[in-house]
């Protein structure tokens, strides 16, 4: 079988990411490298490093969301080299957060880095934050929650 192209991996990624907002982290886990240098920085704070921490953080994130729906991806830019690639996007969702009665729309600014391992593209870093829209200067000085 021919290894997937980077665009094919991005297509898989776009199918997997919304599953987190439906309480299912498994499709995203399948995309990740299992090596100790992987990282995840998500909107719930902190940076997970190494597969064990990243896996736990994905499980935690999936428990925060219910009834998620993907509204779309806006690709800002991407770049592919021989063995590394990155993708910068805005992801748009609707989901219930932390058991809320009503779903809310939200957008995440996301940078994802991939590495080719044994011929296959694997996710090695994902940074997602809610700063998809311009933030006030004051938001920079707010204490971390």
State the predicted function of each range.
Residues 31-34:
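Conserved catalytic core of Hanks-type protein kinase domains
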Residues 1-27, 37-145:
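A beta-strand edge to alpha-helix "cap/lid" segment located at domain peripheries
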């Amino acid at each position: 079988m021919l290894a997937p192209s980077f665009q094919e991996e991005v297509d898989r990624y776009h199918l997997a990411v919304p599953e987190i907002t439906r309480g299912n982290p498994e499709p995203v886990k399948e995309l990740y490298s299992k090596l100790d240098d992987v990282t995840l920085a998500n909107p719930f704070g902190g940076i997970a490093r190494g597969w064990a921490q990243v896996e736990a953080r994905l499980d935690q994130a999936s428990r925060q969301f219910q009834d998620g729906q993907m509204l779309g991806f806006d690709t800002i830019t991407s770049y592919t080299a021989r063995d590394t690639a990155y993708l910068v996007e805005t992801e748009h969702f609707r989901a219930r957060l932390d058991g809320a009665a009503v779903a809310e729309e939200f957008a995440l600014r996301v940078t994802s880095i991939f590495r080719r391992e044994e011929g296959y593209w694997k996710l090695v870093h994902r940074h997602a934050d809610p700063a998809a829209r311009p933030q006030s200067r004051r938001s920079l000085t707010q204490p971390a929650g």
